[in-house]
Amino acid sequence: MHVNGKVALVTGAAQGIGRAFAEALLLKGAKVALVDWNLEAGVQCKAALDEKFEPQKTLFIQCDVADQQQLRDTFRKVVDHFGRLDILVNNAGVNNEKNWEKTLQINLVSVISGTYLGLDYMSKQNGGEGGIIINMSSLAGLMPVAQQPVYCASKHGIVGFTRSAALAANLMNSGVRLNAICPGFVNTAILESIEKEENMGQYIEYKDHIKDMIKYYGILDPPLIANGLITLIEDDALNGAIMKITTSKGIHFQDYDATPFQAKSQ
C-alpha cells in the first residue's frame, strides 16, 4: 500500500511510539487521526505536528479505548471527518500488574474491538476499499516474563489474535491485511514507570530483575519502531506477519512452521 493520500487512525498517538507512528505516516503523506485518552498531551501533540505539517492533515480525538462506546464514536468521527479509513494502528497500551483487569481491557480487549471496528469500515464485503491493521504487541508476547504475567498474557493474545484474524480476513476476501509488531524495551513513558509499585504490584520485590533485563536487551528509540510500521504497511505481501525489533538484530520477523490446515479464501 502506498501511504500517500491515505487516512490513518492511531491510538495512543499523543506520546512515545504512537506519536512516532503519527509523524512517520504524515511524512509519507497520510492524514492521521490522533486518538488518545490524555487531553493535554493530545492537544500538545497536534499543535507540535501542525508546525511541521498542514493542520488539516491531523485530527485529535480524546478517547478511552477501554470504553466501547467511545471507541465506536471515535471511528465514526474519523470517517465522517476524513471520508474514509485505510490504516488502523492499535497502539494504546499499559503495563500494570497491580490493576491487571485494566491491563487486559486496554492491551487486548480494546485491540480486538478496534480491529473489528476497523474491519467494519475497511472490508470490501462491507463496501470498503480494503486497508491494513497493525496491532502493537511486544517481545513479551513471544516469551515469558516472570514479573509481568498479565502483561505477557495480553501481548501473547495480540499475537495469536492478529495471526488468526489475518487468516480470517484473507478467507473472507476482505482486502484488509493484519500484522503485529513486537519490539523490545522502547524509550517511552511506560518504560520509565515500569518498576514502580503502582505498576508491578506483588512483583515489586523483583524490580531489579526488570532492570537486569533492560540492561541485557537494551533500549530502542520510537523512530525505529515507526520504520517497522511503514515496512508492514507498504509491503502488500505481509499478512499475519509478526515483526520483531531488537537492539541486536533490528527489524526482523518471527518464524513459524506452516500450519497443517490452511483455510482457503472463497
UniProtKB/Swiss-Prot annotation:
Keywords of this entry: Cytoplasm, Fatty acid metabolism, Lipid metabolism, NAD, Oxidoreductase, Prostaglandin metabolism, Tumor suppressor
Catalytic residues in the record: 151 (proton acceptor)
UniProt cross-references to InterPro entries, sorted A to Z: NAD(P)-bd_dom_sf, Sc_DH/Rdtase_CS, SDR_fam
The keyword Lipid metabolism appears for this protein: yes
Residues the record lists as binding NAD(+): 12-20, 36-37, 63-65, 91, 151-155, 186-188
Reactions performed catalytically: prostaglandin E2 + NAD(+) = 15-oxoprostaglandin E2 + NADH + H(+); (15S)-hydroxy-(5Z,8Z,11Z,13E)-eicosatetraenoate + NAD(+) = 15-oxo-(5Z,8Z,11Z,13E)-eicosatetraenoate + NADH + H(+); (11R)-hydroxy-(5Z,8Z,12E,14Z)-eicosatetraenoate + NAD(+) = 11-oxo-(5Z,8Z,12E,14Z)-eicosatetraenoate + NADH + H(+); lipoxin A4 + NAD(+) = 15-oxo-(5S,6R)-dihydroxy-(7E,9E,11Z,13E)-eicosatetraenoate + NADH + H(+)
GO MF entry, a single one: NAD+ binding
Main localisation: cytoplasm
Gene Ontology CC: basolateral plasma membrane; cytoplasm; cytosol; nucleoplasm
Its EC number(s): 1.1.1.141, 1.1.1.-, 1.1.1.232
Signal peptide (residue range): none
Subcellular location: Cytoplasm
Amino-acid positions noted as binding substrate in the UniProt annotation, renumbered to this chain: 138, 148
Gene Ontology biological process: ductus arteriosus closure; female pregnancy; negative regulation of cell cycle; ovulation; parturition; prostaglandin metabolic process; regulation of prostaglandin catabolic process; thrombin-activated receptor signaling pathway
Pfam families linked to this entry: adh_short
Family as reported in the entry's similarity comment: Belongs to the short-chain dehydrogenases/reductases (SDR) family.
Self-association and partners: Homodimer.
Function as written in the Swiss-Prot or TrEMBL entry: Catalyzes the NAD-dependent dehydrogenation (oxidation) of a broad array of hydroxylated polyunsaturated fatty acids (mainly eicosanoids and docosanoids, including prostaglandins, lipoxins and resolvins), yielding their corresponding keto (oxo) metabolites. Decreases the levels of the pro-proliferative prostaglandins such as prostaglandin E2 (whose activity is increased in cancer because of an increase in the expression of cyclooxygenase 2) and generates oxo-fatty acid products that can profoundly influence cell function by abrogating pro-inflammatory cytokine expression.
Annotated protein name in UniProt: 15-hydroxyprostaglandin dehydrogenase [NAD(+)]
